[in-house]
Regions:
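Internal intein/HINT superfamily modules and their associated LAGLIDADG
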Residues: 1-374
């Protein structure tokens, strides 16, 4: 097994490489994708009309599509899966597309909220499991959700979105299916990847609800004063198999994670591991990639607060964010202190009911969220 570590430096160097290095641009375009990859990616021209995401069906006036679309796209690209059977599959059993989003058990309220809000799918709570599933498998529900997130995808899961949309479109256009459940409905007009600024919509809120966290480290220094260190972290992992006859390595999470690092003006850390499989598998090996953004600088944490105040988290991480923000603001106003009511004491007290140790949950933040029209 071979591990390699990289640090992608912030603002200046990333832009310079992107604009001035043809070799770098090429490398960026051939990085591996998550499950299924980008394959032979089809490109679609933007019609610059993200507002009209539901076509030829009842428009739900309760939904704020401009905010719901990016949030759900981020959530699905983080902890969701769009399952579409390959058209070339030789399996006798055929199945239509389905969308699955996984929530930890504590976030059952959020799963139910999104299910009821979109009127798509069902929520399943597994007995003796620490997670719940939001499952959308009916054609109308899949059609609706694909329309909502259309134009807001930012990661390699866009490829699965495209295959799902194409399946739906082929189904709509089919003249051989007698019982077409999507008659008199327009095709999904597939839009390209969203390359807008990270701070322009709620995509990062959805992704953070899935894969981000707000941490508090307590450093008990000997030669220097003890400190409470708050930081925001987002890490995305991917893997794929490659053999001597397969050189189709495509897009990865590198681009989107670089954009997030650039937005907060921090470094992007990456790690890779090569795992050789059986020789009989034609020199096949599996590649693992990990990309991590960490925001620990006090002033940059303020920008984190500004973003998530504008586009609130909706999971129980919202409660962790509120506590985390208290510590960041206290340190910003008064500095580090081990005195009574100082940052050290606050950090200790917050961690008693925080992240994995949290036992107190409230859901008032799910009332009249920004995903709904007021």
């Amino acid at each position: 097994m071979i591990w390699k570590y990289h640090v992608r430096f912030g603002e200046g160097s990333f832009i310079w490489m992107l604009l001035h290095s043809d070799r770098f641009a090429t490398l960026l375009l051939v990085m591996p994708a998550l499950i299924g990859g980008f394959g032979n990616q089809k490109r679609y021209e933007s019609n610059n009309n993200n507002n009209q995401v539901i076509e030829n069906k009842e428009y739900n006036l309760k939904l704020n599509y401009d905010k719901l679309g990016p949030y759900l796209a981020g959530l699905i690209e983080g902890d969701g899966t769009i399952l579409v059977q390959n058209s070339s599959s030789i399996k006798k059993s055929k199945y239509r597309p389905l969308i699955v989003v996984v929530f930890k058990l504590e976030d059952l309220e959020l799963a139910n909220y999104l299910c009821n809000l979109t009127k798509c799918g069902k929520v399943y709570k597994k007995i003796n499991r620490n997670y719940v599933l939001w499952l959308i498998h009916d054609l109308k529900g899949v059609y609706t959700l694909l329309n909502i997130i259309n134009g807001y995808m930012r990661t390699p899961k866009y490829e699965a979105f495209v295959r799902g949309a194409e399946f739906i479109n082929n189904y709509i256009n089919s003249t051989t299916i007698l019982h077409n459940k999507l008659k008199n409905i327009d095709n999904i007009k597939i839009k390209p990847l969203d390359t807008s600024d990270i701070g322009s919509n709620a995509w990062l809120a959805g992704m953070t609800d899935a894969d981000g966290n707000f941490s508090i480290n307590l450093i008990n220094g000997k030669n220097r004063s003890s400190r409470a260190m708050p930081y925001y972290c987002l890490e995305l992992r991917q893997n794929y198999q490659k053999n001597s006859n397969n050189n189709n390595i495509n897009f990865s999470y590198f681009y989107i994670m670089s954009a997030i690092a650039l937005y907060f003006n921090v470094n992007l850390y990456s790690r890779e591991r090569n795992l050789n499989l059986l020789v009989s598998l034609n020199n096949t090996y599996k590649l693992y990639y990990s990309y991590k953004v960490i925001v620990a600088n006090l002033y940059k944490n303020i920008k984190v607060i500004e973003y998530f105040n504008k586009y609130s988290l909706l999971s129980s991480k919202h409660l962790d964010f509120l506590d985390w923000s208290k510590l960041v603001i206290l340190i910003n106003n008064e500095g580090q202190s081990i005195k009574l009511n100082g940052s050290w004491e606050l950090g200790i007290n917050l961690r008693k009911d925080y992240n994995k140790t949290r036992t107190t949950f409230t859901w008032s933040h799910l009332k009249n969220t920004y995903l709904e029209n007021k």
